[in-house]
């Protein structure tokens, strides 16, 4: 039996192109892994099965973890199965790659469990058929993600940046989010290059100035809860941004003491919100 940690991701930038002939959208994004995570245990078995001991997630073949296991055995030609156990802490439908990170962890875990010696890069390439965020989650750390998310340019991670993750009690489907962007034709300036430079220089002010997500302009008019969440978080006088297609946001505190203060303030004001302390990880 082995254990894999599935780290959530945030988008420091997310620019979305127009819809392509294949139905997908091209993106340009800086993604970073964070410490908020799910835990997955894997044990050899004759078939593929999944049990969830904490939190909620789809069961059976609807779950990307099961699909990832099927993909692994199909690609490697190995005979066998796996018993998967999930402890779920990453919020679902939050734009944090929760399902994607779980699938990525299954691929990495099976690679270890069966001593398959498949490279991370190959696992990432295989995973693109399951979901656009999964290749990044296989590799983790930090990267510029282009294409539909599968073209990765690794960046040096900026580890241990304190942050807060906030998710109001509203869900946003990714398909609906892209549909709203196409309908409204709203886009913001692409700050990805500025963000990459800020990360290279370890310039916090420049990083904060580069935060950008096209989905905010597309979704805020549709979901007042998201607009109100953003307005409230900005009133705390720290940089904040919605991640992915929502509905989670992250806030960048000035330091760990400020992180503790903001956590207490937000929890007291909004007891029905998911609020978690986290940090960036390598």
Across the structure, where does each feature detected by a protein language model lie?
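Residue-level recognition of strand-loop junctions within catalytic nucleotide-signaling folds
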Residues: 17, 252-255
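ATP-binding N-lobe of GHMP and related small-molecule kinases
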Residues: 1-94, 112-121, 157-158, 167-170
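Solvent-exposed alpha-helices and their adjacent loops that cap or buttress functional pockets
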Residues: 32-33, 128-129, 135-138, 155-159, ...
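Contiguous, small/hydrophobic- and glycine-enriched helical/loop subdomains that border
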Residues: 81, 103, 107-144
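Conserved, helical-rich catalytic subdomain that frames metal- and/or nucleotide-binding sites
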Residues: 50, 139, 144-239, 254-267, ...
């Amino acid at each position: 039996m082995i254990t894999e940690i599935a780290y959530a991701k945030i988008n420091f930038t997310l620019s979305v192109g127009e819809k392509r002939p294949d139905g997908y959208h091209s993106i340009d994004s800086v993604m970073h892994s964070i410490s908020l995570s799910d835990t997955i245990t894997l044990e050899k078995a004759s078939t593929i099965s999944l049990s969830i001991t904490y939190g909620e997630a789809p069961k059976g073949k609807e779950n990307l973890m099961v699909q990832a296991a099927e993909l692994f055995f199909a690609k490697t030609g190995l005979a066998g199965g796996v018993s998967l156990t999930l402890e779920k802490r990453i919020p679902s439908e939050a734009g944090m790659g929760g399902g994607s990170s779980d699938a990525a962890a299954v691929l990495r875990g099976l690679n270890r469990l069966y001593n398959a010696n498949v490279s991370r890069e190959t696992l990432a390439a295989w995973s693109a058929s399951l979901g656009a965020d999964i290749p990044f989650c296989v590799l983790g750390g930090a990267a510029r993600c282009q294409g539909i998310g599968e073209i990765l340019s690794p960046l040096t991670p900026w580890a241990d940046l304190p942050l807060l993750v906030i998710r109001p009690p509203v869900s946003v489907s990714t398909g609906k989010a892209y549909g709203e962007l196409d309908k409204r034709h709203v886009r913001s300036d692409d700050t990805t290059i500025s963000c990459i430079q800020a990360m290279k220089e370890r310039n916090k002010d420049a990083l904060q100035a580069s935060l950008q997500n096209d989905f905010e302009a597309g979704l805020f008019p549709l979901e007042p809860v998201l607009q109100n969440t953003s307005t409230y978080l900005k009133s705390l006088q720290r940089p904040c941004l919605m991640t992915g297609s929502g509905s989670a946001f992250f806030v960048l505190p000035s330091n760990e003491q400020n992180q503790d203060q903001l956590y207490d303030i937000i929890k007291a004001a909004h007891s029905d919100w998911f609020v978690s302390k986290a940090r960036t990880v390598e």
